Amino acid sequence: MLWFQGAIPAAIASAKRSGAVFVVFVAGDDEQSIQMAASWEDEKVTQASSNNFVAIKIDTKSEACLQFSQIYPVVCVPSSFFIGDSGIPLEVIAGSVSADELVTRIHKVQQMHSSKGEASVTNDNQSESSVSTPSASFEPDVCENPESKNTELCETPATSDIKSDTATGGECTGHDSHSQEPHGCSNQRPAEDLTVRVERLTKKLEERREEKRKEEAQREIKKEIERRKTGKEMLDYKRKQEEELTKRMLEERSREKAEDRAARERIKQQIALDRAERAARFAKTKEAEAAKAAALLTKQAGTEVKRESTARDRSTIARIQFRLPDGSSFTNQFPSDAPLEEARQFAAQTVGNTYGNFSLATMFPRREFTREDYKRRLLDLELAPSASVVLLPAGRPATSIVHSSSGDIWTLLGTVLYPFLAIWRLISNFLFSNPPPAQTSARATSTEPSNSASSSKSEKREPVRKRMLEKRGEDFKKEGKIYRLRTQDDGEDENNTWNGNSTQQM
């Protein structure tokens, strides 16, 4: 099918010039439109519509279809309109048909178009023959065709415009007939038809466009009003939602605060109960501890009483062990108030003249008693309740080696009994050398002479300590707080000198 490439007004003008049938094919995107388009593209249809047909194809979504539908209502899609010279639709095909059916319809339209053309020629001849004798019955015939053409070509919903145009055309025709010029009017009719129709179509299209613009403006205004109304409603709805949300949040917060307060109250009550329970438990514990402490104090008091009684009993007696130079020893008990002279006399009576003139001394602490000490009490000399005293023969130092008595018998006995004597000395030193704790209190409550004696003993020990430190200085080398043994190289290191960069100078 050869489709006209141009707008609808140009296609109408081309059809008018050639006296052809104006074909308008309104197609869409559906399946029927595709089938109908295929029928139009068929070779049979192309051959049948090659002469006396000006065809144009428009889309339903285009502006041309909108303009065309304002004159010829488009009922369904697809649609095919066959419009004659007068603007009257000769045939309208609604929907999709086959190619053969379409060829049949085209032939039918050709017959209708040719018959209408002959009728129009006959009417023109009759009008020319009757120009000399005009009558009243001719007037409606002369103006019938323009009126019908105008009505058929411009058939739209706006019927008031068509009626006004028809009335105007009628008046013009009547005026011409009364002025005895029917022949001139009939000659100008073909030229006027096309111009008037095009002008009317253009004017009506402009009016329709203006109405459409106004309608669009009104529609936009309504849309804007609706949009504003909808926006206001949405804002109101959102505000209500926000208010409800805020209200719910406040209620939730109030409920949470109430729950927090209740939880805090429960915690406070639990803390108070725990404190009361701990206080009661602590009081019970304190009472139990106080009872235990009282029982312990009572027990300790009883123990102290026993100790004091034992100490008093023991403090009244001084047990003295006399150790002889040959390693033997003997023991005797004396009153604690007895002087040391009594103990010396007992030792002299026991040993006789074996060791001659001797003196008494203690080894731990090391002390040799003088003549003045013999007059003092055993308690004052810290020899009560027990002590170990060594007999020192005259002329021998306290640290001298003890020799056995003359005679092979004593040597043999000393050799045999020496292990037993050593064991006995260890046991006796362990048992009798250190006084019990009760003696410390007795010593603390001793008189002033005992303090003076201890001070004199400490004064005697000072020279010995100094000599030991001097001797230690010879054997050890002090480096800060560390002592190390001296070697042969230490003397050489002390004689050497060192410079600032740790290099030895000889």
UniProtKB/Swiss-Prot annotation:
Residues 457-489 have a biased composition (Basic and acidic residues). The keyword Protease does not apply. Residues 110-194, 437-506 are annotated as: Disordered. Transmembrane segments: none annotated. One of its GO terms (biological process) is response to unfolded protein. Residues 444-456 have a biased composition (Low complexity). Keywords: Endoplasmic reticulum, Membrane, Nucleus, Phosphoprotein, Unfolded protein response. Residues 313-391 form the UBX domain. The modification Phosphothreonine is found at residue 487. It is a peripheral membrane protein. SUPFAM superfamilies: Thioredoxin-like, Ubiquitin-like. Residues 1-411, 433-506 are cytoplasmic. One of its GO terms (cellular component) is nuclear envelope. It comes from the Eukaryota. Its main location: endoplasmic reticulum. Gene3D superfamilies: Glutaredoxin (3.40.30.10), Phosphatidylinositol 3-kinase Catalytic Subunit, Chain A, domain 1 (3.10.20.90). Directly interacts with VCP. Interacts with UBQLN1. Forms a complex with VCP and UBQLN1. Involved in endoplasmic reticulum-associated protein degradation (ERAD). Acts as a platform to recruit both UBQLN1 and VCP to the ER during ERAD. This is UBX domain-containing protein 4.
